Amino acid sequence: MGTARFLSAVLLLSVLLMVTFPALLSAEYHDGRVDICSLPSDSGDCLRLFEMWYFDGTTCTKFVYGGYGGNDNRFPTEKACMKRCAKV
């Protein structure tokens, strides 16, 4: 039972790295931190249907979020997205 649990954890970690690593490569960094507004939209891994907003580099755009996973370029409202990401 212990070996199966360990292999499941390794598999889960591998999948998470495969999903996360490309997004991190495409992100912009400032002072060593990821600029979340430069991350691509990511609907996540589940099949729920939450209407959210992401910054596409120019403006905030609606997308459907699955409810789990994804990245931090995800906001509950257009106003929250613009407040965080729009450059004035």
From Swiss-Prot:
Pfam families: Kunitz_BPTI. InterPro entries: Kunitz_BPTI (IPR002223), Kunitz_BPTI_sf (IPR036880), Serpin_venom_toxin (IPR051388). It is found in: Secreted. The keyword Signal applies. The lineage of its organism: Eukaryota, Metazoa, Ecdysozoa, Arthropoda, Chelicerata. Disulfide bonds join C37-C85, C60-C81. The record marks L39 as: May bind Kv1. Keywords: Disulfide bond, Protease inhibitor, Secreted, Serine protease inhibitor, Signal. SMART domains: KU (SM00131). It comes from Cyriopagopus schmidti. Expressed by the venom gland. Residues 1-27 form the signal peptide. GO terms for biological process: envenomation resulting in negative regulation of voltage-gated potassium channel activity in another organism. CDD domains: Kunitz_huwentoxin (cd22598). This is Kunitz-type U15-theraphotoxin-Hs1f. PROSITE patterns: BPTI_KUNITZ_2. One of its GO terms (cellular component) is extracellular region. Residues 37-85 form the BPTI/Kunitz inhibitor domain. Serine protease inhibitor that inhibits trypsin at a molar ratio of 1:1. Residues 28-33 form a propeptide.
